[in-house]
């Protein structure tokens, strides 16, 4: 599966937030946006704002691809209910993101590696597809050998149980978590490292499909 291999710190500086949850905050060394004229903020057009919100959402979930955005929008646009919520849920409930939210990895990129390398189980069966959609009631756990990985033990040691989203449950001792219910829009938004206008993104994608 294709993945982003570009400069992550540059993206964090662009949006002014430690968006990937890295231990070393890249903004402490270089707080300004990248580029020769990083301090200068030009007024953006509506189209420019839509593009920026789209890029923010991609970054929040580990640099997801454009085609994944389009596919997710197509899957929810004709369904009854809150399109923005259903659209955002498509990314919040990705397996790699759930692994990250549970605290099995310190960053979304580390979570992606855990999944891709076959360390993660869904209802007791190995799933190595990062974009796998986790549904309520599904249990996420780690292989017994994988539980001794340094990236896992260090992350769980620092995981504050109070920071766990209300739609998840976690048994640290068993290295097991569960998606209890489908997350609401406001619950998902509170977990993002920076505010994202999902409605603007949906409006942008409506002209692309």
Curated annotation (Swiss-Prot):
One Gene Ontology term, aspect cellular component: small ribosomal subunit
GO MF annotation list: rRNA binding; structural constituent of ribosome
InterPro entries for this protein: Ribosomal_uS4, Ribosomal_uS4_bac-type, Ribosomal_uS4_N, S4_RNA-bd, S4_RNA-bd_sf
Residue span(s) of domain S4 RNA-binding: 93-154
Key word Kinase present: no
Biological function: One of the primary rRNA binding proteins, it binds directly to 16S rRNA where it nucleates assembly of the body of the 30S subunit.
UniProt family annotation: Belongs to the universal ribosomal protein uS4 family.
Protein name: Small ribosomal subunit protein uS4
Organism: Chlamydia muridarum (strain MoPn / Nigg)
Gene that encodes the chain: rpsD
